A protein has these predicted regions:
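N-terminal amphipathic/hydrophobic interface segments
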Residues: 21-522
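Bacterial Sec-dependent N-terminal signal peptides
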Residues: 1-29, 522
Length: 522
């Protein structure tokens, strides 16, 4: 409400300046023509009845009507029938009835009121017009039409000299391509720009814009919104503190506290800056990005410095997602990190690059590259290549390990079920009695292996081709035999909860393997 008061004061400031600049000298109102002139005391003292083709003049302004009651001394008259006030070559006012005070150059107009100025048309049933300030005012429902644009409001003000209109209450703006609803609007007609103050909605054929403050360039179909700006379409919406939108190019730029909701794919993306090129099917969001994927089982939280999206331009559905720099994600049953991640939504395949790691339960999966295949919103297959390395923390103190050039990990109910290790396959796993006491360590090498896992423990290994397998009893274990070359247990990097995805995790002394955690066996 305070903002609206400021707008009103600003709008009328120039009116006051104009008023003070006017000469205070009174000018006469002259009778230019009337078919009949009759003095009739019954109509009042000094009242002259003018009948038929009445024409009055004050300065350069002419007043036409069918009849009038005119008081020459007070410069006041009432006009009746076919009122026409012609002020200059471009401004005309029409109505059925009018009251005019020549002393203050102020007119009241009644019924079928029309103000016409160049290509602008104002219509209402009651209007006042101040000739000194060029201000037209209607207090109860009016319409301004300009070319193919139409503006309707309960209250309105129009300065015809500078072609600026001010609208209040139930404002509706209609153009061939859009419809706007707002509470307060200033329309600079020459600039073809509208400034709105208060809750505003702009409807397009496909999109809807909302905001509480901003402007709309109707000529170029460009809008800028602030304070809860929202762009929505079938299946998605973008909300931010401020937003720029170009309808012709279908380009949007969102700034500060950006919130994107995709109801089709059940995804919410948050950040502080984003851009969208809808016709090209491209968009991105950056600065403290958090993405949430909602599934039946749980929600996955993902962070990256920047997130890119590719959309189907026909269906408006997301096809691919690319996350870059400092990628970290968390779900109750799986966590991960890498420096870049791409997700093809159509074939449900995620690709992790640049030092990728996945954690599930007590397992760590690592490789130069990781591909994740998803079925029914659950992890189905994970491909580690090259240099795949899987580590499982033993129930007590050791680590079971699987290593190879290319590894395919199969999941069941989001738990590791078995692993096919192809190329220089190696394993280390701990053997224990039922009471947990250690028997020894099994170390094996083969061209390929198929490893069965139950309850996060290796239970069976099937070897292919040449195999070297050695069981080291507890009493004969050599130092370092329990760790494969390249072993790194990087639990410190693992996201621990949804908020931990923002942590800039780094390897600690323990994680880098400079202590007993580093694999030494060759």
């Amino acid at each position: 409400m305070r903002c609206v008061k400021y707008i009103i004061l600003a709008f009328f400031a120039c009116i006051c300046w104009t008023l003070n600049a006017q000469q205070n000298s009174k000018t006469f109102v002259y009778i230019e023509h009337a078919d009949h002139q009759v003095y009739d005391a019954s109509f009042g003292k000094d009242i002259e009845r003018l009948i038929g083709n009445v024409a009055l003049r004050q300065d350069s302004t002419f007043f036409y009507s069918d009849s009038a009651h005119f008081n020459e001394k007070t410069r006041y008259f009432d006009g009746f029938g076919h009122i026409h006030i012609k002020m200059n070559d471009s401004t005309d006012i029409f109505s059925d009835k009018c009251k005019y005070s020549g002393d203050i150059k102020f007119a009241e107009l009644f019924d079928n009121v029309v103000l016409q100025d160049d290509s602008t048309l104002l219509t209402t049933n009651y209007m006042t017009y101040d000739r000194k300030t060029h201000l037209a005012t209607y207090p109860n429902n009016g319409t301004i039409t300009r070319n193919d644009k139409k503006l309707v409001s309960r209250k309105g003000y129009y300065r015809d000299d500078i072609q600026v209109a001010y609208f209040r209450k139930d404002v509706v703006v209609t153009t061939p391509k859009s419809r706007m609803l707002t509470d307060t609007l200033v329309y600079k007609i020459k600039e073809e720009r509208m400034y709105f103050y208060g809750p505003t909605t702009i409807f397009y054929e496909e999109n809807v814009l909302e905001g509480n403050y901003g402007w709309y360039d109707v000529k170029n179909d460009v809008a800028y919104l602030k304070k809860g700006a929202t762009l929505s379409n079938k299946g998605y919406s973008i909300t931010s503190d401020s937003m720029f939108y170009n309808k012709k190019t279908d380009y949007a730029r969102a700034m500060s506290n950006v919130f994107v909701e995709d109801t089709i794919n059940k995804v919410i993306i948050e950040g502080n800056y984003g851009e969208m090129w809808k016709k090209l099917g491209k968009s991105y969001i950056t600065d403290s990005v958090r993405t949430r994927y909602f599934a039946d089982r749980d929600t996955l939280y993902l962070h990256s410095d920047t997130l890119f999206l590719r959309m189907d331009t026909l269906t408006n559905k997301a096809e691919r997602m690319f996350a870059y720099k400092n990628v970290r994600f968390y779900r109750n049953d799986i966590q991960g990190k890498c420096d870049s991640l791409s997700y093809h939504i159509v074939d449900s395949c995620a690709k992790m690059r640049h030092d990728p790691i996945i954690w599930t339960e007590n397992s760590q999966l690592r490789g130069d590259s990781i591909n994740i295949m998803i079925a029914n919103k659950e992890i189905d297959v994970v491909l580690l290549y090259p240099n795949g390395f899987i580590i499982q923390k033993d129930t007590i103190e050791g680590f079971n390990q699987i290593k190879g050039k290319q590894m395919t990990a199969y999941f069941k109910n989001n738990e590791l079920d078995h692993v096919y290790d192809d190329g220089n396959a190696e394993t280390v796993y701990w053997l224990r009695e039922e009471d947990g006491s250690m028997i020894g360590i099994n170390v094996s090498q083969s061209v390929a292996m198929d490893i069965k896992i139950e309850k996060n423990q290796i239970v069976r290994i099937k070897y292919f081709k040449k195999t070297n397998e050695t069981l080291y009893p507890k009493e004969k274990m050599k130092p370092g035999i329990e760790l494969l070359k390249g072993f790194e247990w990087l639990d410190e990097l693992r996201p621990t909860d949804p908020n931990d995805i923002f942590r800039k995790a780094k390897k600690t002394e323990q994680d880098t393997g400079k202590t007993r955690r580093r694999g030494r066996r060759k």
